[in-house]
Amino acid sequence: MIKRSSNLENQVIQSENFSKKSLENHVFNSCSFNSCDFSESLLRNAHFGTCIFTNCNLSLPKLDGCRFQEVRFVDCKIVGAEFFKCEKTFFSPKFENCLLHYCNFSDLNMKKVSFSGSKLKECHFTNTNLISADFGEVDLSGTVFHNCDLSLADFASAVRYDIDPQTNKIKKARFSLPEAVGLLRGFGVTIV
């Protein structure tokens, strides 16, 4: 079990239940979290550096001031996470085959982020820097992009996205048909 105000390094944490528990001000460096439950956990001002979360549940975590620096999430369920409340300076996550539902990534610098193989359902991106982001094999059902920089982002194998080129920068972003037709919705165009 992790003690109060812990500073852990190079640890493998397996099947731990942190649900509704506080990890406030804890520091984790080069740690692996496998099959852990962080639902509704308090991660205020916690620091995760070069950590990997595999098959973890992060539903409704409290992320005020939390730092995710060079962190990978693999096969995780992340619901209702307000990532915009995280420490913005060092925010550098990578998501692989994750379920991200109702998450908010507004006002973040997510340049070169990868969401590879993930499902982003009704997530929110406003004023987000997503230059060179990888949305490979990503389902973006109901996800909103507003005033984002999507330049050089790769949506070529993404599905169910609805991006308005009038409110987002999409210069040199990659799209493919038939999904790219969604780029015309904001213009009131009818395609037959």
Task: Show which residues each predicted segment covers.
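Tandem repeat scaffolds
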Residues: 1-192
